[in-house]
Structure formats: C-alpha cells, structure tokens
Regions:
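Residues in intrinsically disordered, low-complexity segments of regulatory proteins
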Residues: 52-55, 66, 267, 291, ...
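Glycine- and small hydrophobic-enriched segments that form the cores of compact globular domains
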Residues: 124-138, 142-145, 149, 159-182, ...
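Intramembrane catalytic core of multi-pass membrane enzymes that act on lipidic substrates
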Residues: 1-131, 135, 144-159
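Hydrophobic alpha-helical cores of multi-pass transmembrane domains in eukaryotic membrane proteins
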Residues: 1-9, 93-106, 141, 145-149, ...
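Structural signature of transmembrane alpha-helix termini at the membrane-water interface
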Residues: 9-16, 105, 109, 165-169, ...
Length: 332
C-alpha cells in the first residue's frame, strides 16, 4: 500500500501526461521499449479496453519501460539480442533453474551456521556470544556476505518468474523485459551501485517523493538523503508486515547510512576533483556494504527471514540435484 501511495503521488504531480512509446517486436530500432534515437508516441484512438490495458501496464511497470514521461533511469542491456518470445521463455527458464540451485546452496550454507537460531523461522542474532570477538565477527561477516548474494538471487529470480508469466499470458515482447541488474558486484562506488548497477524498480518514487522535495531547501545532500530515507521507510514497512515488530533503526539505518556514503563520495569529488573509482573504490564500496550490511542482516535474522524455507525439503533444488547425480552414478 505504501508503494501504491508513492506511485499515486508521482502520477498526481507529473508535469505532463504519460504516453506509450513504440515497442520493439523484431529489431525495429527500439531499445528496451524506448526508441533508440527520437521517441515518438503511439497515435491511435483510445478505447476503454486500451485505456484499461495502459493503466494496468503503467501500474505494474515499475521502471516505466515503453513509456514517455517516466523518470529516466539506467536500463541494462542484455547480452543476448532476443527477439522471439519462445527464446526468451526458454532462456529465462534456464536462468531460473540456475538461480534456484544457487539460492538453495546459499540458503543451506547460511542455515548451517545457525541451525538452532537464525537458521530457523523462529530467528536469532547472527552475533554468537559464545565465540571470541574475532570468531564472532568473522562468522557474522560470512553470514552477511552470503545473505547479500541471496538477496540478489531472490530479487532476480522473482523478476525472471514475472518475465516468463507476462510473456506467456500477456504476450509481451522480450524488449519489455531487459535485465534487472547490471553486475552490481563490479561497482566501484556507492553512487554507481545505487544509481546504475542495482535494480532501479523504485527509483522514480524515491526521486519524485523523497529527493525532489528536499533538494529545493537542502541542496544536493538533502536530495540524496531524502531518497535513501524514503527507501529505508519502504523496507522497514516491509519488515513490519511480517507481524514480528519493527526495527526501524537497523533497517532504515542501513539505507540512511548508504545515503551518507553517497554524500561523502560527492564531497570527495568536490574536494579532490576526482571520482571514487578503481580498485580503491571497489574496496570502499564492498567495505561500506559489509559494515552496514551486518546491521540489516541481523534485523532480518532476528525476525526469521534468514531461516525461511522456500522449498519443501523433498523438492529443494540441491536435494533434487544430488538425487539425480546419485541415480546417474548408480546407472553408470
């Protein structure tokens, strides 16, 4: 509901009406639902059905692909120039199979580190008081790192499921489902990570509702902090929806501190004239994520999110894969 409220606010204060752009069907020069050179709107009579269809598409199309008037954002380019729906579905199903297996491997690894605490739905802290400080934080570091990759796999897998369903059920085109991420592990700055390489699903809402209102009064720093603070509120509300209480300081604090990190990068550029980047930038980005990642992952773990099982034990991808390998070895 909070997301719907934000998107409704964006639509109410839009400077001009949203219009549909041509959709790429078979290499007609349109890239990711947007025309490569000079976008032109689709001129046709509006029927009740087309109006309802457009409204539905705008509602679920968080990145505004195929729409003119939506906040422009970075859309990653696919490594495969897919034009056939069947090819997209087959490639996506293959990717889903791999993502499912990777997700289950990561989950098993994390659960094995806390089988009686955070590795179960009842939850528990990732900080083990029975260990020495070096051991405790090495363990929490591993858990945080694995949980970060698990989050990426979960979000990407969910996106791939929707790509298959919408392509089959609603006959959408491959150009309407470009990649969601742009290799976030290659980020050499927090600005690059959040502005380009991580998913941009909520960017329009964060910019229009959280960033622009503060930019007028607090400048660039206020603009950045407004967007990240709103992101923190959105994710904290998601945690509260589980019915296990809120942890605003930890959940929202993670995003607020990333806003602080981005502000620091801009201050560095203004002071030195150089952008954050290279190997040093990668180490900085990785360290900042791990440092504050401990905070949000511990909040997830204490509420049982880390220990949730998505597959029945008998049908876990790793179980099915090992059973298949066992049968194959017996047969040979």
């Amino acid at each position: 509901m909070f997301l719907i409220a934000m998107r409704s606010t964006v639509w109410v204060f839009a400077r001009r009406p949203y219009t549909r752009l041509p959709i790429s069907k078979s290499g007609n020069g349109t890239i990711n639902g947007r025309d490569g050179d000079t976008p032109t709107t689709i001129e046709h009579g509006v029927t009740v059905f087309s109006a309802m269809w457009n409204a539905w598409d705008l509602m679920v199309n968080l990145r505004g692909i195929g729409w003119d008037g939506v906040q422009m954002m970075h859309i990653p380019t696919s490594n495969f120039q897919v034009e056939s729906r069947l090819t997209l579905v087959l490639l996506t199903l293959g990717r889903l199979t791999i993502l499912g297996l990777v997700f289950d491997i990561l989950s098993r690894c994390v659960h094995s580190l806390g089988p009686d605490t955070f590795g179960t739905p009842k939850g528990g802290s990732i900080f083990d008081p029975s260990l020495t400080l070096p051991e405790r934080y090495m363990k929490s570091f591993i858990i945080t790192l694995l949980s970060g990759f698990t989050s990426y796999v979960t979000i990407d897998g969910t996106y791939q499921v929707h790509a298959v369903l919408f392509t089959i059920l609603f006959q959408q085109y491959p150009s309407q489902w470009p990649p969601l991420f742009d290799s976030p592990w290659l980020s050499t700055s927090l600005t690059s990570f959040w502005g380009r390489r991580w998913h941009q699903l909520f960017r329009e809402c964060f910019v229009a509702v959280g960033s622009k209102p503060l930019e007028r009064y607090l400048g660039r720093a206020g603009s950045i902090m407004g967007a990240f603070a709103l992101s923190g509120v959105l994710h904290d509300i998601g945690i509260q929806g589980m019915g296990r209480g809120a942890d605003t300081l930890s959940v929202a604090g993670f995003f607020v501190m990333h806003g602080v990190g981005v502000v620091m990068e801009h201050a560095w550029k203004q002071t030195t004239g150089r952008r954050v980047g290279g190997i040093t930038g990668w180490l900085w980005t990785f360290s900042w994520h791990v440092l504050w990642g401990h905070v949000i992952v511990d909040a997830w773990a204490r509420r049982g999110m880390v220990g949730v099982g998505f597959f029945p034990d008998a049908y876990r991808p790793t179980t099915l894969f090992l059973n298949w390998m066992s049968r194959k070895n017996v047969a040979s």
